[in-house]
Structure formats: structure tokens, C-alpha cells
């Protein structure tokens, strides 16, 4: 029986943006269908399920986290079955994500889940959902996914946007907290934000003025945030 007051939501609220951005970008190129909506929901549900699975291994009184794992894990399992029934090739995707999650678990067991390498694995897990959102609407109903060589160039542009934004945000947050006493890392974060702005604008240029403007505003904001907030590093607690 779960302990009284057992949490059912992860406390890391910033992670939700990491989940939402790739889903939105994937829907922009792949379209919104019942299957893509179900995939998006399943991807979001997987995060709290994985959080509580790690928490059971990581923290004292693991019974506190069993309720959250049951709620999110069972919901995610139902969604996974429905998705695999509709797109059997998602079974291979699930296996790849299981391997990636095993890496997350290994870092958690070593009490090193905040390492840069573990962050990189989480970013890859998030960014990969962009092409998967496209593929799920491509109509393939067997064990072989649709050929990604047939995907529009827009897909890879938006995937690159997701990668740049998530890597930059991860570096920015680390520069404010875990690396707050490391001016070199803070400068590296700011340089990456500047390079991301230039790269994203170059990628958006072929798609017209509106795409160029939206991209410049989005990545320009990330650069300004890095420069302004980077002056006063935060202190934990």
C-alpha cells in the first residue's frame, strides 16, 4: 500500500518543456492524427513513469514512489500496446528506448544521474520523437518502418531545431546551477546559444520570411536569456 502523501507527479517541472517541444515540432511536419496524438500522450506519460522507476532505485523509502509508478506505468503500457498494434515497427523503437532507459537507470544506481552523458541520452530520447511523429503517420503497418529517405527536408530541419534548443537549454541550466562556479562553462553555453541562432536562421532561410522570423525570434530569445541570466548564477535551494 502506498504511503500517505505519496507523490504522483515528478518535481522537475522544466522537463515537461523538453517533452512538449519535440512533439509540437513533430506534429508540424507529420500532421495531427489520432495515432500521433496517442503517441504524444504516450511519450509524455513515459516521463513520469521513468521518473518513479528511477526514484524507487535512487531514494530512501521506495514505497513512496510505487503509486506514481503504477499510475503512469500502467497507463503507458496500455498506450504502448495500442500503438504497437497499429504500427508494429514501433516495437523496435520501444527496444531502442528501453536500452536508452537502461543507461538512465545505470546512472541513477551510481547516483550520477545529473552527469552530462546522462543529459545527452535524455536529449536524444526527446529529439528522436520528432521523426517518429512523422513516421507514425506514413501509413506503414508492418514490422518495417517507413523509409526516412522519403521524409521531407522540413523534418530534419525541425529535428535540428529541437536538438539545438534542448542542448542549449541543458547547458544554460547547468551553467546557472551545477556549473555556476565555472565561468568557462557559462561562456561555452553562451557561445553555443549564439551558434544555435546562426545555424537555425541558416536552416530556416529556404522556407521563407515567416519561418525565418519565427526562428530568429525563438533562438534569439534563447541567446538573450543565456547572456542576461548568465550574469547571476543561481544557488540551489
Task: Enumerate the language-model features and the residues they cover.
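N-terminal topogenic module of multi-pass integral membrane proteins
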Residues: 1-94
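Small-residue-rich segments of transmembrane alpha-helices in multi-pass membrane proteins
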Residues: 20-23, 68-78, 120-135, 187-200, ...
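Interhelical loop and helix-boundary elements at the membrane-water interface
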Residues: 1-16, 60-68, 105-124, 176-192, ...
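Hydrophobic alpha-helical segments and helix pairs
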Residues: 78-133
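Alpha-helical transmembrane segments and their membrane-interface exit regions
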Residues: 42-52, 98-108, 126-128, 161-172, ...
Amino acid at each position: 500500500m502506498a504511503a500517505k502523501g505519496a507523490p504522483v507527479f515528478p518535481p522537475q517541472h522544466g522537463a515537461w518543456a523538453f517533452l512538449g517541444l519535440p512533439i509540437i515540432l513533430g506534429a508540424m511536419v507529420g500532421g495531427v492524427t489520432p495515432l500521433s496524438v496517442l503517441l504524444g500522450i504516450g511519450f509524455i506519460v513515459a516521463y513520469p513513469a521513468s521518473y518513479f522507476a528511477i526514484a524507487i532505485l535512487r531514494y530512501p523509502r521506495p514505497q513512496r514512489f510505487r503509486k506514481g509508478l503504477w499510475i503512469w506505468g500502467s497507463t503507458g503500457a496500455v498506450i504502448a500496446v495500442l500503438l504497437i498494434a497499429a504500427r508494429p515497427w514501433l516495437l523496435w523503437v520501444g527496444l531502442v528506448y528501453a536500452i536508452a532507459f537502461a543507461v538512465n537507470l545505470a546512472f541513477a544506481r551510481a547516483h550520477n544521474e545529473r552527469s552530462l552523458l546522462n543529459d545527452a541520452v535524455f536529449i536524444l530520447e526527446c529529439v528522436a520523437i520528432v521523426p517518429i511523429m512523422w513516421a507514425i503517420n506514413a501509413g506503414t503497418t508492418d514490422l518495417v518502418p517507413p523509409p526516412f529517405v522519403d521524409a521531407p527536408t522540413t523534418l530534419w530541419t525541425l529535428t535540428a531545431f529541437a536538438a539545438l534548443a534542448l542542448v542549449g537549454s541543458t547547458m544554460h541550466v547547468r551553467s546557472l546551477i551545477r556549473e555556476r562556479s565555472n565561468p568557462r562553462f557559462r561562456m561555452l553555453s553562451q557561445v553555443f546559444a549564439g551558434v544555435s541562432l546562426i545555424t537555425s536562421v541558416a536552416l530556416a532561410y529556404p522556407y521563407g520570411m515567416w519561418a525565418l522570423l519565427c526562428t530568429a525570434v525563438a533562438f534569439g530569445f534563447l541567446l538573450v536569456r543565456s547572456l542576461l541570466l548568465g550574469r547571476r548564477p543561481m544557488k540551489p535551494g
